[in-house]
Regions:
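Short, high-confidence coil segments that cap the C-terminus of an alpha-helix
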Residues: 96, 182-183
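Short conserved active-site loop signatures built around small residues
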Residues: 166
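Active-site histidine-anchored catalytic micro-motif
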Residues: 169
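Short loop-beta-helix segment that forms the pyridoxal 5′-phosphate
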Residues: 155-162
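Conserved "HGTGT" condensation-loop signature of ketosynthase/thiolase-family condensing enzymes
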Residues: 1-155, 194, 202-223, 229-231, ...
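Glycine-rich anion/phosphate-binding loop at the beta-strand->alpha-helix junction
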Residues: 184, 189-194
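Alpha-helix C-terminal capping segments
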Residues: 147-151, 174-181
Length: 241
């Protein structure tokens, strides 16, 4: 088995941006779940919403194609903990073609489609002219965005198999590293809040009217949230070069 090094990692969720808020929340028992106030959703439930995403602006050269909540969440996470600098250093060290991108997502930027659907033409059903399927709803959008954001040209893939997505992304990255196809891999998962997920799980009677308590004998449902987490993997021989 080819040794692989975990060189950097970061995460962003309702707990905060970067690893420090995660550690603090675990140590203090703090929850980031809040009563749902997402978009126009009227549900008696709690959600894990990342604050401030509506105000995040993608770089000018990428905004017209990739602007959506999912990619704004991805960029927010990538810029925490100095992670983006680590990726750029590896791209310079190995070359952009030797850094792969392997990500997991389930709903990607479907929120943009949901909002566009509300604004469709009443007669023809045509979606708004500024709706961008490629850069939003398309599951590959998040990997496409990450590659453009860092100027990477190595192999890229997105896995969309619900809860197993990110685990499979790590497995795919490990195989590419083991075969010597790449020297480093940007791996992770991004999923943002959307109407389909919130209303869907609520329709199944699975959402709790309070913050979820997974290990409580009297637990009464789940809480839906959003988050992004990334890891930078390297072949040990490359990392030690």
């Amino acid at each position: 088995m080819t040794p692989i090094r975990l060189s950097a990692m970061t995460a962003t969720s309702c707990l905060g941006r970067g690893m420090a808020p995660f550690r603090e929340a675990l140590q203090s028992g703090r929850s980031g779940l809040m009563p749902c106030a997402f978009e126009t959703v009227k549900l008696d439930t709690f959600v894990g919403e990342v604050e401030g995403l509506d105000a995040v602006e993608l770089p000018d050269n990428l905004r017209s194609i990739f602007d959506c909540r999912n990619n704004r969440l991805a960029m927010t996470a990538l810029e925490a903990d100095g992670f983006a600098d680590q990726v750029r250093q590896r791209a310079k060290q190995y070359g952009p073609a030797r850094v792969g991108v392997f990500l997991g997502t389930s709903t990607a930027g479907i929120l943009e489609t949901e909002l566009a659907y509300r604004e469709r033409d009443a007669v023809t059903g045509t979606l708004p002219a500024d709706f961008r399927y490629r850069g939003a709803h398309n599951a590959f959008s998040v990997a496409d965005f990450a590659r453009e954001y860092f100027g990477l040209t190595g192999p890229a893939m997105v896995v969309s198999t619900a809860c197993s997505s990110s685990a499979k992304a790590f497995a795919a990255a490990a195989r590419q590293l083991a075969m010597g196809q790449i020297d480093a891999a940007l791996v992770g998962g991004v999923d943002s809040l959307c109407l389909t997920t919130l209303y869907g799980f609520n329709s199944l009677g699975l959402t709790s009217p309070q913050a979820c308590r997974p290990f409580d004998p009297s637990r009464d449902g789940i809480s839906i949230g959003e988050a992004a987490a990334f890891a930078l993997l390297e072949r040990v021989d490359g990392a030690e070069a």
